Amino acid sequence: MIDREGYRPNVGIILCNARNQVFWGKRVNQHAWQFPQGGINAGETPEQAMFRELEEEVGLLPGHVRILGRTREWLRYDVPPHWTRRDNRGLYRGQKQIWFLLRLTGRDCDVSLRASAHPEFDAWRWNEYWVPMEAVVDFKREVYRLALEELERYLHRDLRYLRQHTRRPGERREVPFDLQLKP
């Protein structure tokens, strides 16, 4: 399903843990790290596609996560011609993505890279939110930066929510959080 401009609709997923570290998956048999992502099927909403991709690539179900936010607009990247199949050249330019920021409410052991018959990742790790992007394929870096910048504000909102809801009634002291968010 490619639009008139040559972009395939897609979702990207930034999954973070309670320490605001983000999930990075290592592509099978490659040295490239990336966030989970995948195409939107005909008749699917971006949210439905996100939950399907999350289960296929990371093994997480809707009950394992909470949606913190999503990008307002499509973010696009062009795929270099040598990365596309010959039969798609001329029709396919790249991907347009809606990005979701999710909070893992489950546990690390809920992550399963073998949830589908064709795994995308063979390793995963948690990294700081603003990790350098050298390990990301170069043509995706700008979209990653834009998605991280737009969605970062939801982390601060979520931290305020967590702080407000972890105090006991009548307690006046701040809950100690030693999270360091980079600007």
Swiss-Prot record:
Its EC number is 3.6.1.-. This is RNA pyrophosphohydrolase. It is an enzyme of class 3 (hydrolase). Accelerates the degradation of transcripts by removing pyrophosphate from the 5'-end of triphosphorylated RNA, leading to a more labile monophosphorylated state that can stimulate subsequent ribonuclease cleavage. It comes from Thiobacillus denitrificans (strain ATCC 25259 / T1). Its cofactor is a divalent metal cation. It comes from the Bacteria. Residues 6-149 form the Nudix hydrolase domain. One of its GO terms (molecular function) is pyrophosphatase activity. Gene3D superfamilies: Nucleoside Triphosphate Pyrophosphohydrolase. A motif (Nudix box) lies at residues 38-59. Belongs to the Nudix hydrolase family. RppH subfamily. Keywords: Hydrolase. CDD domains: NUDIX_Ap4A_hydrolase_plant_like.
